[in-house]
Amino acid sequence: LIRAYLGLGGNVGDRQGALEQALSLLVCRPGIRLVRLSSLYETEPVEASGGWFFNSVAEVETSLGPDELLTTLGQVEGACGRPRLRERGEARLVDLDLLLYGSRIIAEPQLQVPHPRMHLRRFVLVPLAELDPGLVHPGLGTRVSDLLAHLSQLPEVRVVAREWCVARAAERSVP
């Protein structure tokens, strides 16, 4: 099994409800088991339109390959009502990103892992550091906590809820 980290976000409608739905659908899929889930954070939009985002990071174990996992994330986004074709920067009901896939570095047209901008985004690094501050970014060789320490304190990232998702009960999902 591979340990992967997934970014979850959304800034349209019932943001928490949409992320809970996405996570519930995700952990019901064969080959994905939720290990841990960060707190739920509210963040100002960065390079996106619409209202403030709710963001979280899920640590999962998966037997899926990186391409399969990315496809699954897209299927879950679609099941939650996100259109397949969308403009960069538009408001998002649900946005699921593959941040890290073990220690693999993947550079393909449709898949870049680690996520190419994760080290620049507080809304990714704050919840990721909550889960594992000593986690090392495979491409940069730097701990997540150190990456976070070198970023500006803006935009603000604030905790909305520590225990927020009913899908935590699904942490027992079997790959």
Where are the model-predicted features located?
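Residue-level signal for inorganic ion chemistry
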Residues: 11, 37, 127
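Flexible, gly/pro- and Lys/Arg-enriched active-site loops
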Residues: 45-53, 64-70, 74-175
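Short N-terminal binding/cap micro-motifs at the start of the first secondary-structure element
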Residues: 14-16
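Short, surface-exposed acidic-centric catalytic microdomains
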Residues: 21, 25-66
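Hydrophobic side chains in well-ordered alpha-helices
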Residues: 18, 22, 69-72
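Conserved beta-strand segments that form the floor/walls of ligand-binding pockets within enzyme
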Residues: 7, 36, 59, 95, ...
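A short secondary-structure junction motif
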Residues: 10-12, 46
